């Protein structure tokens, strides 16, 4: 049964990545992050509560104004800076139609993951877990990169490091991206895909 599941991961899942939401018309948010005044710890806690509540209520543009000063002042304060920040930046990305602005914002989304690794130490969600999230976002926002080599490296590190604690969605994408790379040059990448398949199979055994 496990092998059937793994084969399904390779061949039954579409290779197109993630669909983008429909672009909305109208006023668009500013892309370049404004220079904000550094907040005190007390002010950061207040803003943290405000942006978290705004995200819960899907008021993402309002949340951005509270979130950005906390992110810039105390990036080590709370995991919500990164969990909520990903939602806030994704919302802003969906509002923007200018291609250069979208490229700048998607770079900011990847940087959010880098900053989480650098500033926020979390035993429950270690660096390898965050790399999995970063890879998934790369596949979502950089869909034009057909081979997605950066995402492949992050996915492989996430799976090989986390083992039984690897996320199924990340494991699935790891096999999918590896197979896509293999298809681009079967002679060059056959050994790599076989090794990745074996790693995914062993990891799936651990999870199950």
Functional labels for PLM-detected ranges:
Residues 20-208:
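Preference for long, solvent-exposed alpha-helical segments and helix-linker "stalks"
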Residues 1-27, 86:
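Bacterial Sec-dependent N-terminal signal peptides
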